[in-house]
A protein has these predicted regions:
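A short beta-loop-alpha structural element at the N-terminal edge
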Residues: 1-14
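Conserved beta-strand in the GNAT
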Residues: 50-52, 59-69, 80, 85
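Conserved hydrophobic beta-strand within the GNAT/NAT acetyltransferase core sheet
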Residues: 84, 115-118
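Helix-loop element at the rim of GNAT/NAT acetyltransferase active sites that forms part
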Residues: 15-29
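Conserved active-site alpha-helix within GNAT-family acetyltransferase domains
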Residues: 109, 113, 120-130
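Short loop/turn motifs at secondary-structure junctions and domain boundaries
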Residues: 41-46
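Conserved acetyl-CoA pyrophosphate-binding loop and the N-cap/start of the following alpha-helix
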Residues: 90, 94-102
């Protein structure tokens, strides 16, 4: 597996998978919103930055992002780890763990002082990362 910046060709399969699974949540309730968000992630070196896990055949396995001011209800939290998603056929292989580790390393490289993550149902999964 390789982790790299999200590429344009991954936006559509990622958007479809995210919409299928997360469409009940406001940011993911529209395919057009999802596509626009990931297109923004391709634009330069500023946050948001999205990363893709890719298998040796070049297939998208999952993604994660570094973001700024991700949630309006937490305006005091500037830097976020978000959108951690692994396509169903690649779950259980450690892809999510590697994406999170990659993002934490990238955040350190960028000099981000800390990251926040909001996930009401699986917070304990991420707590072991610190």
């Amino acid at each position: 597996m390789n982790i790299c910046r999200l590429k344009p060709e991954f936006i559509e399969p990622l958007a479809l998978a995210l919409f299928e699974e997360w469409h009940d949540f406001a940011p993911w309730s529209s395919l057009d919103k999802i596509r626009a968000y990931y297109a923004q992630c391709l634009d330069g070196d500023d946050l948001p930055l999205a990363f893709a896990a890719v298998d040796k055949e070049g297939r998208l396995m999952g993604s994660a992002a570094l973001k700024r001011f991700d949630m309006a209800c937490f305006p005091e939290h500037e830097y976020w780890l978000g959108d951690v998603f692994v396509l169903p056929q690649f779950r259980g292989l450690g892809v999510g763990r590697q994406l999170v580790s990659f993002c934490l390393d990238k955040a350190r490289e960028l000099g981000l002082p800390h990251l926040f993550l909001y996930t009401p149902d699986v917070q304990a999964v991420y707590e072991k990362f610190g």
